[in-house]
């Protein structure tokens, strides 16, 4: 039973009549809202037309069974809506994943094309250095992987010493503007700095007189 002090839109008592408290039976709860911090339900009254439906505060009602039934129904509808939304999201994910994969393949292809382009556009300098290393290997001399100071355009300052590397003569040469000296095959030094090589030999030669025993 739902208690209500006023009959919805029908109880217009005359100014001199006393208002009597009447009871009306709630047939069905149709909707729910919160107004000014209070819960209200939209009610269908038993024995009255739909046009007589009214919003009533929860505190004025005495139909807890109908309220609980309505709240459970709302909860079930909310769960069903959430489940439907989750299913829709799952169906959309494979498409999104496929798009990402396709993008990845496209990026990989573009990267490979870019890599091929970079290789084809590499300057001829490194190739020239490689051929120089091959020529040096043909002579049996060991040349640093980065080439000698001469390959880097440096100017020799002084020959500091010489050594026999497995039967191959190399010079320890100090280049201008470089702190550390480096070993250079004699075959390279003889071509690049022949006068400096000759002076190096002359400084270390011992001359003997024909009259000495």
Curated annotation (Swiss-Prot):
One of its GO terms (biological process) is chromatin organization. InterPro entries: Chromo-like_dom_sf, Chromo/chromo_shadow_dom, Chromo_dom_subgr, Chromo_domain, Chromo_shadow_dom, Chromodomain_CS, Heterochromatin_chromo-domain. GO terms for cellular component: heterochromatin; nucleus. Residues 105-115 have a biased composition (Polar residues). Keywords: Chromatin regulator, Nucleus, Repeat, Repressor, Transcription, Transcription regulation. It comes from the Eukaryota. This is Heterochromatin protein 1. It comes from Drosophila virilis.
């Amino acid at each position: 039973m739902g208690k209500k002090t006023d009959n919805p839109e029908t109880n217009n008592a005359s100014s001199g009549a006393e208002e009597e408290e009447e009871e009306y039976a709630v047939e069905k709860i149709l909707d729910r809202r919160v107004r000014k911090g209070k819960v209200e339900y939209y009610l269908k009254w038993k024995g009255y037309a739909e046009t007589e439906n009214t919003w009533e505060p929860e505190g004025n009602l005495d139909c807890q069974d109908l309220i609980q039934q309505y709240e459970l129904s709302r909860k079930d509808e909310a769960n069903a809506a959430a489940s439907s939304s989750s299913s829709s999201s799952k169906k959309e994910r494979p498409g999104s994943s496929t798009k990402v994969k396709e993008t990845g393949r496209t990026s990989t292809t573009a990267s490979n094309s870019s890599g091929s382009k970079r290789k084809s556009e590499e300057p001829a300098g490194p190739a020239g250095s490689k051929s120089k290393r091959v020529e040096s290997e043909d002579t049996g001399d060991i040349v640093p992987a980065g080439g000698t100071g001469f390959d880097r355009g440096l100017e020799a300052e002084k020959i500091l010493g010489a050594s026999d590397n497995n039967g191959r003569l190399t010079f320890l040469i100090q280049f201008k503007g470089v702190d550390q000296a480096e070993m250079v095959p004699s075959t390279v030094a003889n071509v690049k700095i022949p006068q400096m090589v000759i002076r190096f030999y002359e400084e270390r030669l011992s001359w003997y007189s024909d009259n000495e025993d």
